[in-house]
């Protein structure tokens, strides 16, 4: 009986009291004057004393993303969308041309052509795969100790009634506001693995059919090429947040949100990008009293807020909208 009582006492309070959900994006950290903007990341990998892997990544991103990479108006959501549009098709076509030589020139060294085919794609694989690691290296340089709490935001939080879903990797909530009911959905410093990138996870795999090859071609060479072609797909996916898989991984968390009697959803610095909307859709679908919910945006950008309202309506949000003042000015 004691165990049952403790279960009800601890878990019952946890499930019944939570009435506030805060959804936080990068604008939240930037409102605390933390250098976590896209431009800050670019400045980091452009610095003169950057190690070679960061310089190589910079050149690589310029090549595959183009001039917008340097645009001062470029935001994280723009960067993520551009990563999703990265086109390796020319590199793959070049490889397929080299593959053709494997069987067109049967009198030549197939291993030589195999190497020529896979070398450029191997480079793509290694450089693209470095992005998450370099990103994490950068985010670890952000000094949260320099941030000060925003009192207008702090006053919104009702003790033991608030839960936080953050898309940030920093521990701003934990260290500046001493909050513990925090879910870092894309990972965090000194926490779960960090997810960064676009949302276009590939299921397809590039391969070259062995029956098209010259019989004299070494099967090991063909296997090497196919392995590297698959690696290009893996490199593209290393730039992706596999949202579908991440939702499955965090199914328990989203189930717990459904158990709460959420009455207010506060949104601070979150951009409602298509990539992250599957999470928001799950939240909307799980609200107990959808018509009575207030979805409350930071008043930082009213034009953006009106766009967000339209996005939420399209995703079947039936409640009302409001604003809160997000600075102490």
Enumerate the language-model features and the residues they cover.
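SIR2/sirtuin-family catalytic core signature
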Residues: 1-32, 41, 48, 247-329
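Generic alpha-helical secondary structure signal
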Residues: 39, 55, 74-77, 151, ...
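N-terminal non-cleavable signal-anchor helices
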Residues: 11-14, 43, 217, 223
